[in-house]
């Protein structure tokens, strides 16, 4: 099964660099959380069946350039080797590249204006980034460590800027944010999402 091959390859890429999520969870925990959200809500923005493998690849591999020492070309080749066609591999690699943080000394430098411009310009990247944030917020809220409590506060403080930075500037559904995902993140952060999608 194509999706299972993609999932397994993403897990292996992060395991190969001994990356963990939190203190002791395998990084696959986070990757699966992001992919599960994309699979559940992606139909709202994924308008073509042939894009599904690329979007799911993007979800599972979204941190692979940043954390697993892969290059853009590595990602594209990996997608092809797993069974995506050339167009799908390009779409997948573009999502992963868009979600790769910039070089920077601070969080603000690593995810600045240019970073979010790249996400907004890349089909399906806004949704995958939103899924990534939801997965990270969920995890932070469930953990007892000071670090995770601090990150939960950071995510809450960043919320207005984060949403504004992801909000689509086009009617292209591929750049959209599934309404249910946005409202889910609002609920997790304890912020009011009423009226957000009203004309």
Residue ranges and their predicted role:
Residues 1-199:
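Active-site helical microenvironments for divalent-metal-assisted chemistry
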